Amino acid sequence: MIAAQTRHAAGVLEDCARVKQSIVTLDMEGVLTPEIWIAVAEKTKLPELRRTTRDEPDYDKLMRGRLAILDQHGIKLSDIQAVIGSLRPLAGAKEFLDELRALVQVVILSDTFEQFAAPLLRQLNFPTLLCHRLVVADDRIVDYQLRIRDQKREAVAAFRRMNYHVISAGDSYNDTAMLKEANVGFLIHAPDNVKQEFPQFQAVEAHADLLKLIKGAM
């Protein structure tokens, strides 16, 4: 009896392993929405805030620099949130995401922060977002807390351990670990330096082209 149950359980697990159940992970900024820090740089006329993960692969170095600039110029969380409230998703992003979510489960893996994301998520019909959190005191951003280190890659690795076929897309240096960990990875809207350093990832510029690639990889 026990042996039969064991064989049955093994058979069920084997059947599960044969089923290719896909999940898609996407970066947010630069893929679905404008780059928040570039928008803040334009509003505050501080060009040094234009530096993003497209330019700097060391995320902690990038964020420490941003926090120092904000402190130096007295820029508060509410100032940044006002800028974010004026932003709209990239052209075609909502339609792309709506169609994709009708086909497959989608998770947004972003190095943005909970306190930044809500206005943009609302316009995208509230997709699932995993991101980090700011430490705020009296409206001043004093620090940031990572969800976990290397959260994009770790999330993809966890999905793969759950027997998901993971398809990932991003645009920046901080997405490349996620793309490497995924079963299939694509670049969209990536700058030339990222495309040149990571030629193994097919690169596209249009959401329609990315949707075709994802459908083909499922």
Give each language-model segment a name:
Residues 115-166, 197:
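Substrate-recognition "cap/lid" segment bordering the active-site pocket of phosphatases
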Residues 51-61, 195-206:
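A short, conserved beta-to-alpha structural element at the edge of catalytic cores
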